[in-house]
Amino acid sequence: MNTKSKAQQVFGEHAPQYASSSVHVRDDSLDIIEKFVDGTKYNIAMDIGTGAGFTALSLSKFSTLVIASDPTSQMLQQAYNTYSNNNIKHISIVQNIAEQIPIKDGIIDLITCRKAGHHFSNFKSYLEESHRILRDNGTLVIADSVSPEDLEAEKWFNDIELQRDLSHIYNRTPTTIKNLLHNAGFQLQCEKTTRIYLQFSSWVARTGVNPQHINSLKQQFTEASANIKKHFQIQNSDNDISFSWPCLVVKCAKITKTTR
């Protein structure tokens, strides 16, 4: 099974859970995105890896037209329901993977991608595609969970996420992401870090973790080293486990060939 079909399987089977997930509906990362794009009216905006469509819904306040893109048809149906329920008519839906975007060169004013980049099989190709379809000096805003700049924490984070979600590819460090952006032709304009606050029970339920595997995952949280518990704020909470992932939000501008 390839990575694309893994993502479609995981998110296709559990699209309703993501549509009702509080950390996907709205959290600090979406608030930061709105602050980053507020004050500008965009002609065409595109949200890549839109999932249930909440970021694209937010962009509709700042854009004449929004394109919501995702590889999973069930997720796009949830997005369509979200827009219909809010009587939003200027959002178009497109099904595609992030590494192959069916859009002409240089016509998009704003691209966003929230909590999806760690699922992309080729993050570099996604950035290259974003650069291709953005107009000169167009804006790219990415928000995603990131690994700490600590090898033990980076390994633990990615191992635990892959056990919970077979479509997981990699949570990169902030340094890695910013280097990839620079190499793809983007200039960092501003950045902000925040946290994604989670509860273990809803975290495993969202991807339908096999009940027989839940105890193994829980044990890896409770028996994690002090370093891991500090990085991810792991603690017992009302018969559950609370924790948080670091999240990086960056706003970048496409650098034109004449200025690179």
What are these regions (language model features)?
Residues K115-A116:
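Short catalytic micro-motifs in class I SAM-dependent methyltransferases
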